[in-house]
From Swiss-Prot:
GO terms for biological process: chlorophyll biosynthetic process; protoporphyrinogen IX biosynthetic process. It is an enzyme of class 5 (isomerase). It catalyses: (S)-4-amino-5-oxopentanoate = 5-aminolevulinate. Keywords: Chlorophyll biosynthesis, Cytoplasm, Isomerase, Porphyrin biosynthesis, Pyridoxal phosphate. This is Glutamate-1-semialdehyde 2,1-aminomutase. InterPro entries: 4pyrrol_synth_GluAld_NH2Trfase (IPR004639), Aminotrans_3 (IPR005814), Aminotrans_3_PPA_site (IPR049704), PyrdxlP-dep_Trfase (IPR015424), PyrdxlP-dep_Trfase_major (IPR015421), PyrdxlP-dep_Trfase_small (IPR015422). Homodimer.
Amino acid sequence: MPKLTRSAELFEKAKKFIPGGVNSPVRAFKSVGGNPIFMAKGQGAYMTDVDGNTYLDYVGSWGPFILGSMHPRITAALERTLTTIGTSFGTPIEMEIEIAELLVEIVPSIEMVRMVNSGTEATMSAVRLARGCTGRDKIIKFEGCYHGHGDSFLIKAGSGALTLGAPDSPGVTKGTAEDTLNAKYNDIASVELLVAENKGNIAAIIIEPVAGNTGVIPAKKEFLQALRDLCDREGIVLIFDEVMCGFRVALGGAQELYGITPDLTTMGKIIGGGLPVGAFGGKRSLMENVAPLGGVYQAGTLSGNPLALTAGIETLKILKDENPYPELERKAAFLEAGFRDNMQKLGLNFVQNRVGSMACLFFTETPVESYDSAITCDTEMFGRYFTSMLDQGIYLAPSQFEAMFTSAVHSNADLEKTVKANYIALQAAAK
């Protein structure tokens, strides 16, 4: 077990001033036991904590660091912006056009785009736009899918809500809950039933095409196509939440991978290169309803600020120019195969789901295709696995219901180290 004296001291101090001592619930280590680790520095595929311990990082700031931490091109670009341009103006800037052009070029569904400050803002704004354009009130989401902490989405949510065993949050009004309908992931019949029961009053269907906050659960292609067809028939806006899987599973996101185009797309994480950013975009006919062009209001003091846009533009250019996706696939497949071999040697049969460089090892033998199957996992067993990996210098998300992210800077030696650690951790978990 690494020495964590300073982390423990900081956590005690943090709890005096910050609710729970953290600024996002999943960071608190509640589902794995122990105290959270305070980090001091990130570099490439590694993080170093305040006690001087170094970890191989498979969280990647919860997804943004597909190119690793402190990428030299991104940090150099940020330094130029900071010293020669500034941090914010509250006016239009040329970089807003540059990133918009890149997003229109890269993402199949996007004809126009609006920058915001987070993935939550993006999903909230997209749903408001869908309601404004259709004149309808209700939305359909899917059990276990996480779309940020907007009130409409905290009904059988994933991510920290699932980790804490609290799928509904106090403070969400009954009216909001009544306008949010939950369907079962990968089950088109459950969606069709809700649409039939609420005929003419469904504004949008929002989905993570690769769910990343109930572990990792890919949608079946025929399911996404059925959603597309249903939305076309019923005049419903189809929203792909690609905050996590966008630019991760393919340059153009899951919609490129599946070949299915939504009406609106929400983005975040990778397009900020580690800085706070989000975006929503889609069909011109919908986006032209956003203020000031249309009547659907959305605004943000720091939206499109130079630092976030610099990191996003540079990240997208690197991904576009260098195409790391074949190599990311090779690396993630190596880990998947290594974990599978380890389980076979130990007589274990846990489930692995993976799409590109997003993966999850589920501590269940039930195939995981939905929220219901995900929650069959043995979370105590995962806790033992997590602790053993941490003891060996491998930093995973402190929750069974989060993704493991492989980055472009994980080396072959890093991957081999991870597979060896996995064998030991599986032994510890199965005791």
